[in-house]
Regions:
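Domain-level signal for soluble alpha/beta catalytic cores
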Residues: 1-408
Length: 408
């Protein structure tokens, strides 16, 4: 995994705006309508090349395929990061009509019920709804996504070879987050988790074997806290989370840690988030995931202050932190100096070589496409400004030294 002691590298979390030509076919797929496979393949390949070109043109260092192989049914979609896996796993069928389990019971929704009624009526769209019939596992889980994954890898590697970028990454859902779906086959939660982990391991290994960085998306690690009713103790929740981390580590066995990064956030919907679990309460569990880098939400008003956690928590030697310094949670485009300040908060505590500037979450499907590119441009410019500051990390100190000289 690329890192630098000469400048602040930049990346993002994954989802980028899909072009209308791709969304048009995605809608047909979701509606069960006929579509031309060759046309879809051509549009997908072209779209991946274009999205890689745009990222490189703006100056993002570590880029991806925009998650274009993960089907969305519209320009706004909060669920494709995980729902894509339904098409790559066996052992499930559509369940009974009803509300998605992932939306039920959130304490934040209970506190702000009037707000959420309006939000649900206007903007919340998830591709995992399966036409109002949430899928349920009813048999042994297997991996059947080999062709779809091979297409994603081939499209991205071809596109990556045509642009100037430091590195490329591909996202995949972690078993803990996907296990929030319904299980009617496995006898225990743990058995269900490990079956998912074993199946998804095929995807993880293929991405690493393709010489790409694997990003594991696991917002469920902190985010499921809000779904637990009644509210558990922090210790109880950490035990619950550790089972998921252990299953993930099982899936990652033998894979090189320095080719894998792990992303958490507190859900990408535009809500109050007053019941989010503080990072301080889960950071020790986070650091038990056997990867080379940790991507965390840190660029919005609910979590921006949590850089201070790292004053007291040691990032393990050789690891990298990828804090979000621009956010999906607001249409306001961050000023590059604000971005630089956020980066420097982390760099002064952890050391600049241990920080890559990122985004809070995937930007595609959360904010308008024009704003996505404006925010990524601000990210790049902010990283340049932060690079000009000489940073001497003093672990445990809240006032490390800086100067205006650029580090050689």
């Amino acid at each position: 995994m690329k890192r630098s002691d000469r400048r602040i590298l930049t990346s993002h979390v994954g989802s980028l705006p899909r072009p209308e030509a791709l969304i048009e076919i995605n809608r047909a797929k979701f509606a069960g309508e006929a579509y031309d496979q060759k046309t879809y393949a051509a549009r997908l390949s072209t779209a991946v090349k274009e999205i890689c070109r745009k990222q490189a043109e703006i100056g993002v260092d570590i880029i991806n395929d925009g998650e274009f192989g993960k089907t969305t049914r519209g320009p706004i979609d909060y669920g494709a990061w995980s729902s894509y896996a339904w098409g790559r796993l066996s052992g499930w069928q559509p369940g009974e009509p009803g509300r998605l389990p992932a939306l039920a019971g959130r304490r934040d929704r209970a506190i702000f019920d009037e707000f959420y009624r309006e939000l649900d009526a206007t903007s919340f769209i998830s591709s995992s709804a399966m036409g109002g019939r949430p899928p349920v596992f009813v048999g042994p889980i297997g991996y059947v996504g080999h062709q779809a994954l091979a297409t994603d890898l081939a499209n991205f590697k071809t596109a990556l070879s045509t642009v100037k970028a430091e590195e490329g990454f591909i996202t995949a859902v972690a078993p803990g987050s996907f296990a929030r779906r319904q299980n009617q086959y496995y006898k225990s939660d743990e058995e269900f988790l490990y079956a998912l982990a074993e199946a998804l391991r095929e995807e993880y290994k293929a991405i690493v074997d393709a010489d790409l960085v694997l990003q594991l998306d696991d917002p469920g690690l902190p985010d499921t806290w809000d779904m637990a009713n009644p509210e558990p103790s922090v210790d109880e929740y950490k035990k619950f989370a550790m089972v998921r981390v252990e299953a993930l580590n099982h899936a990652l066995r033998g894979l090189p840690e320095d080719r894998i990064r792990y992303h958490i956030c507190w859900g990408s919907w535009h809500g109050p988030h007053t019941t989010d679990l503080p990072l301080r309460n889960i950071v020790d569990v986070l650091l038990k995931v056997r990867v080379g880098a940790y991507s965390i939400e840190a660029g919005n008003v609910r979590h921006e202050h949590e850089w201070k956690v790292w004053r007291d928590v040691k990032l393990p030697d050789g690891k990298v932190l990828v804090p979000g310094v621009v956010s999906h949670a607001t249409n306001v485009v961050e000023h590059p100096e604000v971005v630089a300040d956020r980066i420097l908060n982390f760099a002064r505590v952890l050391g600049r070589e241990n920080v890559i500037a990122g985004t809070d979450c995937g930007l595609g499907g959360r904010i308008h496409p024009q704003l996505v590119w404006a925010k990524l441009a601000a990210l790049v410019e902010g990283a340049k400004l932060a690079t000009k500051e000489r940073v001497i990390a003093r672990r445990g100190s809240s006032h490390p030294a800086t100067s205006g000289e650029e580090m050689p």
